[in-house]
Amino acid sequence: MALKGLDWSGFHAPTLDDIEALASAALAALPEPFKSLSAEVTCSVAEFAEDDIIAHFGMESPFELMGLFTGIGMTHDGAVPHTGQFPNTVFLYRRAILDYWAEHDEDTLGDIVTHVLIHELGHHFG
């Protein structure tokens, strides 16, 4: 039975593109020198982490992982990419982020995306 007075027909969950836009805004707002030092780090948004990643970390559910840094951190010779090296990448996982957002109404979605992104960038910086 639908509740009268609540028309949700025009509302949809934030998309992968929406999360990517929030992440791009967070990256653009980074202060120097962090902005320039993270310029080569790519950001990718997916629904969930791959099953092998969830298993690697011993997690029971893909909802447990909101973000992941892959690559070689700056303190481990990752400041300058080597031939054949994949770029350092921050992965953001949309469904886990949205689930966290639904459970923690004191934070905006932008705040959560920014927090996860900065946490993962911390691994880039060592």
Regions found by a protein language model. Give the residues of each.
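Catalytic Zn2+-binding segment of zinc metalloproteases
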Residues: 120-126
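Active-site rim/adjacent substrate-binding subdomains
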Residues: 1-112, 124
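Short alpha-helical catalytic segment bearing the HExxH-like zincin motif
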Residues: 112-120
